[in-house]
């Protein structure tokens, strides 16, 4: 029977992660590490050797892997769901359908899919720019599995996994930013064509720098998708609050876009700031989320605002690319920018009944300083009431006259 043999191969393949000369020792936990703790081949100076078949103690033994396979098979035949109640964790009765029933499995390049208006949803995990070279890492398992499967399945005939088809930014394969953006766009085009008009695309993405997010957003929007929702999986609150590069995992939900409207960058920036403010207020009031998670959601909402105007955002008479906008969004959400006090003041003038909270939100991620604005009478606080220093404000007029007459620190 092929099934038991392949189940044994699965267990053996998993046990390879911790039973190889590439496995290191985790001193803090007194056990072996698996080889892909860094998503790379990282040969240790002092490999860790365990009992491959299993003892009372140890990590990643064949016995443990085999037990995991059995648990998986049993779950697939009688899947359930667990949920938390006030009395503890509860488990549902088994579902009416087994995992794997009424399923069609295909192997190949997804860009070869020729479906048209067929799918209600596409749930995927796209390549991560230059973050993880899956084709390189998967060879570790492939070469072992091929010994057993090469005569059974045509996909195991080649000596190694495919390289040229991989959508990555990898200099070793003569693939850079342009190739990644083009090929990722090809994939999104295929998904767009295969979805029904009311279909939905959902995928996870992980990276840290604005360039990779810019490439993703550019390819996604070029394929006529609009970001409609984002959900954080993990984030680093310290990096968000300190303005450092942030690594986070995020679930992105997108749908076919409607007609996109032209907009100036200043107007879009105000929309992004306003949306971020509303998002932050809503999440802090109703949910117990970390600031890092809230920051990720704010970032996603900013992506949504941009995707409604992709290819139509103008600054100084030029159309901004998605990568340029993402750089600015990073500045608004977490870093500094060249937006100064006058820019913030002009943004406040656009708001109905601006408040001190609006000032704080608009200043966030800019080089503007609220104290400098206060010293220049661009705003003032009178008995807790926020007042803008407009042309008809007497104190603002007095400040300007003083500067013009040279009695102050005039220019």
Language-model features, listed with the residues they occupy:
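Short, positively charged loop/turn segments that connect secondary-structure elements
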Residues: 349-378
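Short acidic-aromatic active-site loops that bind/stabilize oxyanions
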Residues: 173-181
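Short glycine-centered segments of the SAM/dcSAM-binding site in methyltransferase folds
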Residues: 200
């Amino acid at each position: 029977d092929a099934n038991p043999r392949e189940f044994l191969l699965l267990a053996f393949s998993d046990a390879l992660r911790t039973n190889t000369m590439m496995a290191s020792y985790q001193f803090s936990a007194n056990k072996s590490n698996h080889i892909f703790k860094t998503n790379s081949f990282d040969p240790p100076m002092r490999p860790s050797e365990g009992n491959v078949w299993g003892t009372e103690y140890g990590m990643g033994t064949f016995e443990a892997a085999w037990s995991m396979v059995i648990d998986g098979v049993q779950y697939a035949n009688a899947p359930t769901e667990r949920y938390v109640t006030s009395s503890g964790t509860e488990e549902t009765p088994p579902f009416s359908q087994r995992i794997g029933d009424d399923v069609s499995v295909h192997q190949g390049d997804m860009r070869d899919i020729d479906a048209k208006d067929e799918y209600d949803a596409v749930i995927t995990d796209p390549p991560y720019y230059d973050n993880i070279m899956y084709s390189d890492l998967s060879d570790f398992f492939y070469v072992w599995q091929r010994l057993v499967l090469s005569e059974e399945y045509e996909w195991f005939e080649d000596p190694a996994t495919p390289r040229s088809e991989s959508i990555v930014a990898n200099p070793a394969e003569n693939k850079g930013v342009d190739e990644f953006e083009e090929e990722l766009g090809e994939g999104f085009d295929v998904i767009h064509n295969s979805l029904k008009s009311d279909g939905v695309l959902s995928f996870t993405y992980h990276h840290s720098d604005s360039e990779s997010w810019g490439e993703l957003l550019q390819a996604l929007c070029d394929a006529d998708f609009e970001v409609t929702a984002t959900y954080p999986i993990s984030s680093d609150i310290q990096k968000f609050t300190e303005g450092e590069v942030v690594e986070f995992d995020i679930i992105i939900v997108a749908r076919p876009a409607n007609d996109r409207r032209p907009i100036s960058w200043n107007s879009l920036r105000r929309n992004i700031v306003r949306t971020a403010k509303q998002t932050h207020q809503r999440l802090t009031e109703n949910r117990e989320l970390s600031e890092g998670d809230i920051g990720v959601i704010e970032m996603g909402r900013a992506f949504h605002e941009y995707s409604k105007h992709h290819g139509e955002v103008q600054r100084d008479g030029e159309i901004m690319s998605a990568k340029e906008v993402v750089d600015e969004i990073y500045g608004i959400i977490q870093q500094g920018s060249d937006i100064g006090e006058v820019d913030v003041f002009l943004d406040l003038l656009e708001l109905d009944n601006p408040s001190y909270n609006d000032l704080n939100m608009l200043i966030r991620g800019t080089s503007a300083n609220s104290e400098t604005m206060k010293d220049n009478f661009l705003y003032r606080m009178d008995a807790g009431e926020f007042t803008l220093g407009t042309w008809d404000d007497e104190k603002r007029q007095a400040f300007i006259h003083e500067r013009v007459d040279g009695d102050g620190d005039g220019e």
